[in-house]
Amino acid sequence: MELYLDTANVAEVERLARIFPIAGVTTNPSIVAASKESIWDVLPRLQNAIGEEGTLFAQTMSRDAKGMVEEAKRLNNAIPGIVVKIPVTAEGLAAIKLLKKEDIVTLGTAVYSASQGLLAALAGAKYVAPYVNRVDAQGGDGIRMVQELQTLLEHHAPDSMVLAASFKTPRQALDCLLAGCQAITLPLDVAQQMLNTPAVESAIEKFEQDWKNAFGNLNL
């Protein structure tokens, strides 16, 4: 299983990378824009924060296949080994096919249906990113869509994997993993929710109080 953080906040990546067994960092245009930094400045800093073995993802901005391919090459030249995120539109599928021939690794993003995700995988995307909470917000069933996509990839595109995105709660992320999803990317607030468990803190405080009452200190 691969766990990613969905952010361009370098300081938070450095903090959480010490705690979480993360495989890397995913970004998108909105996330980079929120950082107020040039993508060409923030990407090297993010790569440094996750180390050489960490995988970094960044998205193209062009709407046409030719522009997507050109931007993907620029990203790959700047950060060798970067995974380029391509929106799964008609032009995006064409770009994914071309980038596959160039040996540039891609992720099909903005996936709202299992059939859309399957097309991205068949075109050559290594990763496919279904938007779980956004599907729910539109009246769909994000987890069911992930289950369907996971099954389709297992049968028809085994070299590709689901990298589920767009979570609002830890429960959504866990449900994706239970559905067989091999990778997820968490926004910072959801990652932090996984760490903030009041019941755990209460249990630890009780242990400490009992120990201190018995021995007068908190040392072993």
Curated annotation (Swiss-Prot):
GO terms for cellular component: cytoplasm. PROSITE patterns: TRANSALDOLASE_1 (PS01054), TRANSALDOLASE_2 (PS00958). Disulfide bonds: none annotated. Its main location: cytoplasm. CDD domains: Transaldolase_FSA. It catalyses: beta-D-fructose 6-phosphate = dihydroxyacetone + D-glyceraldehyde 3-phosphate. Pfam families: TAL_FSA. GO terms for molecular function: fructose 6-phosphate aldolase activity. It is found in: Cytoplasm. The keyword Lyase applies. InterPro entries: Aldolase_TIM, F6P_aldolase, TAL/FSA, Transaldolase_3B/F6P_aldolase, Transaldolase_AS, TSA/FSA_arc/bac. Its EC number is 4.1.2.-. Keywords: Carbohydrate metabolism, Cytoplasm, Lyase, Schiff base. GO terms for biological process: fructose metabolic process. The active site is at K85 (schiff-base intermediate with substrate). Belongs to the transaldolase family. Type 3A subfamily. Catalyzes the reversible formation of fructose 6-phosphate from dihydroxyacetone and D-glyceraldehyde 3-phosphate via an aldolization reaction. Homodecamer. This is Fructose-6-phosphate aldolase. It comes from Salmonella agona (strain SL483).
